[in-house]
Design a protein with these regions (language model features):
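Structural register within alpha-helical repeat arrays
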Residues: 10, 14, 34, 54, ...
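Residue signature of alpha-solenoid helical repeat architecture, marking inter-repeat boundaries
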Residues: 5, 45, 131, 170, ...
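C-terminal non-catalytic interaction modules
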Residues: 278-425, 429-437, 742, 869, ...
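Amphipathic alpha-helical segments of tetratricopeptide repeats
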Residues: 32-39, 72-83, 119-127, 157-165, ...
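TPR-repeat structural position
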Residues: 24, 44, 64, 150, ...
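Structural motif corresponding to the intra-repeat A-B loop/turn of tetratricopeptide repeats
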Residues: 21, 41, 61, 109, ...
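Residue register of alpha-helical TPR repeats
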Residues: 9-12, 49, 89-96, 134-138, ...
Length: 988
């Protein structure tokens, strides 16, 4: 191993690389080594670079307490030899002054007197250097705010805003974060959010903004009821700060938000992702933040009954929520006590106590992301359906409760069972004796409630049957016996159970024939028998007999609903046979019958089935209409799983017609209710897939990526390949939009691996192309070339000339990268692209396909233009005195010839004018200024008057760009740009 001292250039290169490394101890260690190596060279400017790099590394890490040593050395070097500092390093030194007081405040071991002294030192040095006092007042404000001195803070804040901004002022984004945070402290949430708006909108950004603003905005948004924005800020913001070691305070804001919005499970996952945050002591202030929100979260878990649950905490110990609560509160209090002792007041510990004591802001704010384990009990539906009873009964008035229950039963309302149960409980509490009919109803409805547990349900049905018999209601008694046999038959699926059901049905049929049972009772029993039996050839005929019977008795009491039930079952059987067109009409008729019967809540079932079927048939309008109707009519009758399914179907239908904002809302609801129904892996993953796609199309890539990343494990485990491919495709696009091309390429390639086995290869080819594009953006030219080759082979096999031509051109450009073949291979790829386009153009022309021919003509022309660009860009020099061998002139002449070929092939429009301007620049570089000017004036004449109005991306925007470039060509060629009046006079 060589011990040779690295050269200065090697160290400079290493410093550049070190600045781009992830924050943390590893980067700091390299920065420390580079200082030693730079010092050994004796090169003072290089040593200054290394020291500044070390200061930055410490400042943006968990070792902020080490910041002061290299800074003190820099300051000493400045005081001793200011001439060693050039303008940039002098600026950097004064810039870092601002950090010192803030870093001192965060270290309780540094006396307050030293901090105040440093603040005066900063003011003195800034004055000597001629800088504005804006940064000084900002430092004064930070000290006062930390100390809880409101009057001093308000005065410093006002002075800060009044002072001029200069080169030493904090960046706009950081300033606005501090100003908004103060407004939150003062209880002015809306004002804070207005202050932060330019940062949130991307007008002002920096290395740590909008990261901090997104975290700080969470609780103000929730307090103001702006829950959708809060959710979006969490999904977007946590993604930004998760990999950054220095953002412990912002991460704490996300944990706090989750703890106070019913997302405790999500908060636990965030804690688990940052175990070092419990032990990194270099920044006591953010350590206290982390401990405080950990304590807050543990308090919530204990309050929810999860005190003995295992939770992530400091390494080396198995923690329960209760134990971590005690630890976090104790350690946070110890840190705050150190601050209080330093500051001479209890401002820090008071803020800590207030933070720990915070209560939930909302019961549950669905985030759309998958929590690996739920902690809270399932929530009730948000909007229960109105009960049929006009006036709620007194809970101890048995007579009123019975009347309410009868009214609900007469209305066939789904709340009838609960009403009978309430009446029964009230009778027991008050010792009220009930008659046989009421006791029968109570037992009957209790059996229905326990239907899936035959051991409980059957005795209740038997009791109800006896009571109905005693009350002189033989039809109801027989119907109860059918229900008992039905419950057993469904659970056991045995011949004996089916025989018992047959016997009960026969008994009920005899009663109906004798006029002692209703058609409704018989129809219900008949349908039950058909549902229990194994599918058979006679089912269709039997169903038609039931429907005919129900139609015959349709005018009898409550028979419209029974007819609807029969038609719904018929529709299910029809769908199973594959006749989806017929069953759609049957579901629609069943829903209408329920509405005619005045029982819209029962229409929810056929409406839901119709919605599902319509979505499968790509009938998105019917799917949307039916899902909305089912959600409206289902009300309390819908459980979490059915509610989740309907919201997701509705979301998918809305997304299919481009209503992505509303689709995202319903997909979010679908994911939430799937979680409540313990269906996260199945239904929840589908909802999150729909949500991720809708968010992506809405331009919310960070939220989309976060949602899709949490959905993918479930999709891979429990869903078909089509959904997995779609999820990875959308995730790849989201990551691409977030400028994470390497990660995007990984998703595209994983999706392509699945799609390669499909019979239809279109998706495989597109995914290979997308992967290649992302690999190229990531600087992985070799891998990109392989992916483009893969895509090209697929396009060729599918006889798709347009994407094949584009893939060949992309491969050609890659050849200019080191190790990728160079210009000769690039020319060959462009020539192949031109040949493919020419052959396809000839075929389209011969076939009389004008649209295809026009498209291919544009691709051929574009290939010629790009060939010229490739040749010119690969040329190391330009025509002129330095072009001693004439190679540059030859390359530019060839590039011009390619551009002229493109101009002759392109039709009128932006593509041809772009080629014309390319030719103009080349003419100018070749010294043919008159020819260049002539081309430029032709473009000006073409676009004269078209650059007014419209947006930047429209025709007016293109016209403005072309006119501006043409005038630049004229200036470059040494001519005055022609104004409108000269163009009109014929000078163009």
């Amino acid at each position: 191993m060589s011990n040779q001292q690295p050269t200065a250039e090697t160290i400079r290169r290493a410093l550049r690389q070190n600045r781009d490394e992830p924050e943390g101890r590893a980067r700091n260690a390299v920065a420390e080594r580079l200082v030693a190596e730079a010092e050994a060279t004796g090169d003072t400017p290089l040593l200054l670079q290394a020291l500044f790099n070390l200061v930055n590394a410490y400042a943006y890490s968990s070792e902020r307490d080490k910041f002061f040593v290299p800074f003190a050395r820099l300051l000493r070097m400045w005081d001793e030899r200011p001439g060693d500092f050039d303008g940039e390093s002098a600026h950097h030194l004064h810039w870092i002054f601002k950090w010192v007081a803030g870093n001192m405040l965060d270290q309780p071991g540094i006396p307050l007197a030293s901090i105040e002294k440093w603040q005066r030192e900063m003011e003195h040095r800034y004055r000597l250097a001629g800088h504005s006092e804006r940064a000084v007042h900002q430092g004064e404000f930070r000290i006062a705010r930390h100390l809880g001195d409101t009057a001093r803070a308000e005065a410093a804040h006002a002075a800060w805003l009044a002072a001029d901004r200069d080169a030493m002022a904090d960046c706009h984004a950081c300033e606005l974060h501090g100003q908004g945070s103060w407004q939150v402290d003062r209880g002015r949430d809306e004002e804070a959010l207005r202050t932060w708006e330019p940062v949130l909108a991307g007008q002002y950004t920096c290395a740590h903004e909008p990261h901090n603003v997104l975290a700080s905005s969470l609780l103000p948004l929730v307090r103001l009821g702006r829950l959708d924005e809060a959710r979006a800020h969490h999904l977007r913001g946590y993604r930004l700060v998760r990999p950054m070691e220095s953002m412990r305070g912002a991460v704490a804001g996300h944990v706090e938000f989750c703890a106070l919005t019913g997302n405790e499970a999500r908060a636990l996952e965030i804690l688990a992702e940052h175990p070092a945050y419990f032990t990194d002591t270099g920044d006591p202030d953010t350590l206290m933040d982390h401990l405080a929100v950990t304590g807050l979260l543990m308090r919530r878990l204990v309050a929810l009954g999860h005190g003995d649950r295992s939770v992530p905490g400091p390494a080396g110990t198995d923690w329960t929520a209760r134990a971590l609560l005690a630890h976090a509160e104790r350690e946070a209090a110890a840190v705050s006590a150190r601050f209080d002792a330093r500051n001479g007041n209890d401002a820090v510990s008071r803020r800590l106590r207030e933070r720990l004591a915070a209560g939930p802001l909302v019961e549950r704010l669905p985030l759309g992301v998958r929590a690996r384990q739920r902690l809270t009990a399932p929530a009730a539906p948000a909007q229960p359906a109105p009960a049929a009873a006009a006036v709620p009964a007194d809970r101890e008035d048995v007579g009123a409760l019975l009347a309410e229950a009868r009214a609900l039963s007469d209305a066939q309302h789904p709340d009838a069972g609960a009403a009978w149960a309430a009446a029964g409980r009230a009778a027991e509490r008050t010792g009220t004796a009930l008659g046989d009919p009421d006791r029968a109803e109570i037992a009957d409805h209790a059996g229905i409630a326990a239907f899936t547990d035959p051991g409980t349900a059957v005795p209740l049905f038997d009791t109800a049957a006896e009571l109905y018999e005693a009350a002189g209601k033989p039809g109801e008694a027989a119907a109860c016996r059918v229900r008992a046999a039905y419950a057993k038959a469904l659970a056991e699926r045995t011949g004996r159970a089916s025989a018992a059901l047959d016997a009960a049905l026969d008994a009920l049929r005899e009663l109906h024939d004798a006029g002692r049972a209703t058609a409704r009772q018989l129809t219900g029993a008949w349908l039950a028998r058909l549902e229990v039996g194994p599918p058979g050839a006679g089912d269709e005929a039997e169903l038609l007999r039931i429907i005919a019977f129900a139609e015959e008795h349709r005018d009898e009491e409550r028979m419209a609903g029974r007819l609807a039930d029969a038609i719904t079952l018929h529709a299910r059987h029809t769908a199973a046979r594959g006749d989806v067109g017929a069953c759609a009409g049957l579901f629609a008729r069943a829903a209408r019958l329920h509405h005619e019967a005045g029982t819209p809540w029962y229409a929810a079932e056929p409406e839901a089935l119709l919605a599902d079927l319509s979505l499968q048939r790509d009938d998105h309008a019917t799917a949307e209409e039916s899902a909305r109707a089912a959600l409206e009519h289902g009300a309390t009758a819908l459980g979490p799983v059915h509610r989740a399914h309907l919201h997701t179907v509705l979301a998918a239908a809305l997304a299919a017609r481009g209503a992505d904002a509303e689709a995202a809302d319903h997909a979010l609801e679908g994911a939430h209710w799937a979680d409540e129904g313990d269906m996260s892996e199945e239904l929840g993953a589908w909802a999150r897939l729909v949500l991720g796609g809708a968010l992506l199309r809405e331009g919310r890539a960070a939220e989309s990526a976060t949602v899709l990343e949490t959905a993918l494990p479930d999709l891979v485990r429990a869903h078909h390949d089509g959904r997995v491919v779609q999820a990875r495709w959308w995730l790849g696009e989201a990551l691409r939009d977030l400028d994470e091309p390497r990660a995007a390429a990984e998703q595209f390639l994983l999706a392509a691996e699945i799609a390669q086995d499909w019979e239809e290869q279109q998706d495989h080819a597109v995914l290979a192309n997308l992967a290649a594009d992302s690999l190229e953006r990531a600087g992985l030219a070799g891998e990109a070339a392989q992916a483009y080759c893969r895509a090209g082979e697929l396009w060729r096999a599918m006889e798709r000339p347009v994407p094949l031509v584009r893939t060949l051109r992309a491969r050609a450009w890659l050849t200019l990268h080191d190790g990728q073949g160079g210009l000769a291979e690039g020319r060959a790829a462009m020539a192949e692209a031109a040949a493919v386009a020419e052959e396809a153009l000839a075929a389209a022309t011969a076939a009389g396909d004008g649209a295809a021919a026009a498209h291919l003509r544009a691709e051929l022309a574009g290939t010629h233009r790009q060939t010229g660009e490739l040749i010119v860009r690969s040329c190391p020099g330009e025509p002129g005195e330095d072009d001693t061998d004439g190679s540059a002139r030859a390359a530019y002449e060839e590039g011009l010839a390619c551009a002229e070929r493109a101009i002759t092939i392109f039709g009128p429009g932006p593509a041809r004018s772009a080629a014309q301007l390319m030719a103009a620049w080349l003419e100018a570089d070749l010294g043919r200024h008159a020819a260049a000017a002539e081309r430029a004036r032709a473009v000006i004449a073409e676009y004269h008057g078209q650059d007014e109005g419209g947006d930047e991306g429209g025709d007016a925007g293109v016209a403005a760009q072309r006119l501006a470039e043409a005038r630049s060509v004229l200036e470059y060629a040494g001519e005055r740009p022609a104004g409108p009046e000269r163009a009109e006079a014929g000078e163009a």
